[in-house]
């Protein structure tokens, strides 16, 4: 099975993908566990859930653990917004990128602060600014196109 298929199936039933381990015998194993109420959701998983709902694949169990899925619920925190606005070219390029890309990339930066990883936060913020000034999108943000047109 493909990783994305496993993640989507888990989301449909209110589960979340956790740690994965590599093994010579089995290749890769992925731990799946029931999602706790009020658990943290990445913007990427929120978009996956929106897609699964639209396709009629989300079960009642999956619906029970959903967070606020409105795109407006996502906010860019002030330090990140300041870093993006510092150079007008960065801010202009950033605003030309798709909304989903913006949310997924910024969430990846901001999540490091939530989990008390300041070095990782600084590294990710620097990478976002560097790639944005070059007008480059990077990383897995649309599940190879699955999340673009559904």
Which residue ranges define each predicted feature?
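Charge-dense, helix-prone N-terminal extensions
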Residues: 1-150
